Amino acid sequence: FLVLLLVSLMCYAEIAEGSQPTECKYGRPCNSDRDCCWEYRCLSSGREYTCKQDPGP
């Protein structure tokens, strides 16, 4: 529950600071990391770029 609340607050913070509204959804099509919420990055899946969790180094 706390994680969901935190994600919601981060998305609302992005909207409040003037960024484009984003949907916090795994696998959402994107053009850059700005199209994704904090815990996701815009990564290639081979065919297209989608919001996914960053696997790290």
UniProtKB/Swiss-Prot annotation:
UniProt propeptide residues: 14-18
Bilayer-crossing regions: none
Domain comment quoted from the record: The presence of a 'disulfide through disulfide knot' structurally defines this protein as a knottin.
Subcellular location, record wording: Secreted
Function summary: This recombinant peptide inhibits voltage-gated potassium channels mKv1.3/KCNA3 (IC(50)=1.70 uM), mKv1.1/KCNA1 (10 uM inhibits 40% of currents) and hKv1.2/KCNA2 (10 uM inhibits 42% of currents). May also increase intracellular calcium release through the activation of nuclear inositol 1,4,5-trisphosphate receptors (ITPR) of cardiomyocytes, thereby causing an increase in the contraction frequency of these cells.
Gene Ontology molecular function, alphabetical: potassium channel regulator activity; toxin activity
GO cellular component: extracellular region
Protein name: Potassium channel toxin KTx1
